[in-house]
Each structure stands twice: as structure tokens, then as C-alpha cells.
Amino acid sequence: MNLFEQYLEEIATRKKQGLNAKPIDSGDLAREIIAHVKSTNSEHHDQCANFLIFNMLPGTTKAAKEKAEFLKQIINDNYQIDEISIDRAFELLSHMKGGPSIQVLIDLALGQDGENSKKAAEVLKTQVFLYEADTARLISAYRDNNSTAEDIL
């Protein structure tokens, strides 16, 4: 039985006890869920899109890293799914409370896509969970005359 099937069983068991599903923090489970989301033919596509949006823990969990990277792929137009537009992907990143989401937002802000760079910069201006390495990366880009980094700082 794979992790996703185990998660579904756990949800059913918890439901009988009057409990909601546990949040997802496992990177391996997140990858399985994202695989279902990527596959529009998967019978679990819709359910997994919902899990991706609502059940993955934010912050620095392994699931958050997988989610942030997948949202980056959506923003970079590598994947298109009905449930998450580019703007919705930015919104989801904005609520992830630091860690991997900040790295993705900085990648996008300092990237070559002008529109997405501006959107990422606007989200970064609202974030308070930046590590020293994140700030150092922005300062380095600023010193290299990156106008987006200047705008963020």
C-alpha cells in the first residue's frame, strides 16, 4: 500500500472518530499527491488538488518544500491545472510562512519573467519569515543593480 492509500485510510478512521484529516508534513506523501494532481486522468486528481491546497503544512516541512516547488512549476507555466492558476499559486505561496516558499519567491523575483518577478516581489514585501541567507541573497542581487531586489528591500 502506498502512502497516499494509507493517508486515505487514516482519514476514514479519523472521520469515524469525529476528527479531521491530519495535516500533511511528509515530503514523500506530498510527492504522491502532486503526482495525482499532475495527472488529470487520475481518479484522485480533484481530491489531491484539494489536499495540496488545504492539507499541507506550511513552513519548513518537507511537504511545504514539495508544494512550493510545484507552485513554482505552475507559475513558470510548466504545469497547468484548473484548480490553481498562476495568481492562485502566488496566493498559496504567500500563506506558507517562510522556508521553502521564500526561496521560491526569491527565485521568481530575481528571475527573467518581468510580470512574475513583480508579483513575487509584491508577495515578498509581505513576508516576515526570511532567514539570513534569504536576506543575503536579496542584498547580493541589489548590489548587482537588480531593481526588483531594490524594490523588495
Language-model regions: role of each:
Residues 2-39:
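Amphipathic alpha-helical packing elements
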Residues 4, 29-30, 44-45, 67-68, ...:
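Short amphipathic alpha-helical segments that mediate assembly, nucleic-acid/protein binding
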Residues 4-7, 126-153:
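Eukaryotic acidic, Ser/Thr-rich intrinsically disordered low-complexity regions
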Residues 19-22, 46-61, 83-98, 107, ...:
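Structural detector for internal amphipathic alpha-helices that build alpha-solenoid repeat scaffolds
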Residues 27-34, 58-77, 98-110, 129-141:
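Amphipathic alpha-helical scaffolding segments comprising HEAT/armadillo-like alpha-solenoid repeats
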Residues 34-45, 49-52:
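Short, contiguous, helix-prone interaction/anchoring segments in small proteins
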Residues 42, 79-84, 114-118, 145-149:
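Alpha-helix N-cap/helix-start positions at coil->helix boundaries
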